[in-house]
């Protein structure tokens, strides 16, 4: 019995072999929009010679309010798009898609997947107040994977807050808007009153809010996101599979079904990237 493949009846193992025989094939990433570019940046900085293909499914953002079945369906569609572009590894640069769909993706495709999960572990281990906050989507906080992670750290009080509206504002290019500021204050102030000393960002869009978060939070509260950990894991998996591309200039292609200007603005025109519609 062979796993599902978008390439017809060929055995997936054959394609798996081809992916890792061609180290110059790209790293594929997908997210429900522009947020996963925070993960892409971390990967690009750690692995500057790697070609990348990033898929921003902004039309369907946010994933966090969708059902598990919808999230799995969209994640499979995104995966197959990246496989058609010969991705040698796929980074699910979306917390909601990771916590709801990565198990299904790994069961359905032989390409390696890297997921992004809220960094509860380092926050819980290092917290001095034994109280940490997590800001995430509804889809992440209600997922089985997230709740299993929370159960491990029962000695730590974890204050969960759904970031309603944050992804939508980021996707609309309203990072520094009064609406954003108002929402962040309403979400963070109760956590501060509860004496948290760590805030875990449980959505790949949220690192773009760090400048605002730092203005609102007392300086003793540390902010943790997962970008660097995901980049290191991508490096480790490629290294183990002898799949690293170690020289030359990288090509980076970003596909979006949303407003490419938001994508360009969030990358701050700092990177050499080609933008395409899909």
For the regions a protein language model found, what residue spans apply to each?
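Non-catalytic structural scaffold of enzyme domains
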Residues: 14-15, 20-278
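Short, often N-terminal, low-complexity regions
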Residues: 5-14
